[in-house]
Amino acid sequence: LNLDEFALLAPQAPGGTWYPYSFIAPDSNNEPAFSNSIEIINKVVQDLFDKGLRSDQIYFIGFSQGACLSLEYASQNAKKYGGVIAFTGGLIGEKLNPAKYKGDFLGTPVFIGSSLKDMHVPLSRIEASAELIKNLGAEVKTLFFADTQHTIRQEEIDWVNKNMLK
């Protein structure tokens, strides 16, 4: 990724995982880890605001659990961000509940890339997440690949570099 002009903050998941079960498991199964993870991200973002950064200077980037958490945090706190880049992820929860998402992305670019047949992230959840995020005012781009790999592809990186990290 073209990140030479960016300051990178990479919070680490406690114990190496943001939540213990699938992102589409019953919500109670992932508590309290899920709420604690959202709070970790919130503290990082609030610290950036306290240091004088604007929301449009903040990008969220993640893969797999990190992608899901990036989409989830940004959608629960929608405003004009620099962008949200999700390499294989979707909104978190057994069922999507539009009532838990608030705000307006004001055209924030959001990228979601994945395999058409990812073993951890169903295509139907990515599509439903993209639709919900669009309804919150984001400009969403999805790229799907015919493989079955749970990975970040060079084509995804190239698209993000060209269109979001210029």
Question: Where are the regions that the model predicts?
Answer:
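Serine-hydrolase catalytic machinery in alpha/beta-hydrolase-like enzymes
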Residues: L1-Q57
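Short beta-strand/loop motif that positions the catalytic acidic residue
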Residues: F111-S114, D118
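Flexible "cap/lid" loop of the alpha/beta hydrolase fold
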Residues: P20-P26, G89-P109
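Short beta-to-alpha linker loops that shape the active-site pocket of alpha/beta-hydrolase fold enzymes
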Residues: Q12-G16, G90, T148
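C-terminal catalytic histidine-bearing segment of alpha/beta-hydrolase fold enzymes
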Residues: F111, E127-K166
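Gly/Ala-rich beta-loop-alpha elbow adjacent to hydrolase catalytic centers
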Residues: I61-G66, S70
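Conserved hydrolase catalytic core segment
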Residues: E72-G83
